[in-house]
Structure formats: C-alpha cells, structure tokens
Amino acid sequence: MVNEMRDNTVPHMTREDMEKRANEVANLLKTLSHPVRLMLVCTLVEGEFSVGELEQQIGIGQPTLSQQLGVLRESGIVETRRNIKQIFYRLTEAKAAQLVNALYTIFCTQEKQA
C-alpha cells in the first residue's frame, strides 16, 4: 500500500520547499478540521449559495454558520458577493475543492460500494 503511494510522489523537493508546502497543507487541514467548515466547503464545491441556502442545506443556525463562514473567508477559501440584501458565498481555493473531492472519494464512495 505504501509502495503504491511512492509511484505518485512529486519530484524531490528541497527542505525549504517541503517545509513551505507542509505549512500550507497544515493550515488548510486545520481550517477544514471543523465539521461545520468541512460541510460548508463540501456544499460550496457544488457552486455559489446564499447564506439562507447554506443554512437550510446544512441545518446549522445563523450564528454558528456566520462564525464558520467568517473563518473560511479570513483564510481565503471562500469569498462573498452581495446581491441587494442577500450575501452569496463561493469557493475560491481550488486546492480546498480538490482535497474535498479526494476526501469524498475516499470516505463516501467506498461506503456506497461496501
């Protein structure tokens, strides 16, 4: 199993490059480590949603939703667009979308096959 991973490794990196990448990945994983934030990003992979739509889709109350969206916004994973009185959120971080898709493949599609 570990040997399979070696076939997909990236070319050799310098220690400094590896450290920089490790910090980038750790920060992204830290941001996505909260269940509500992970559910939000999973939902936003599908497209742009208003706060009301996210609240309904995820089933989380407005205060918690706003707090977690704020964390995602501050980290640069999502951005907002205002349309009259509604605020819409969309994913801006491609790496977050790729990670969520990989997690979905690992954790969700295998359960369907079992």
Swiss-Prot record:
Gene Ontology MF terms: DNA binding; DNA-binding transcription factor activity
DNA-binding region, residues: 51-74
Chain ranges of the HTH arsR-type domain: 17-111
Keywords: DNA-binding, Repressor, Transcription, Transcription regulation
Keyword Transcription: yes
Pfam families xrefs: HTH_5
Described purpose of this protein according to its UniProt entry: Represses an operon that probably comprises itself, PD_1892, PD_1893, PD_1894 and blh. Binds to a palindromic AT-rich sequence spanning the -10 region of the blh promoter and blocks transcription of the operon.
Matches recorded under NCBIfam families: HTH_metalloreg, sulf_sens_BigR
Record-given protein name: Biofilm growth-associated repressor
Gene for this chain: bigR
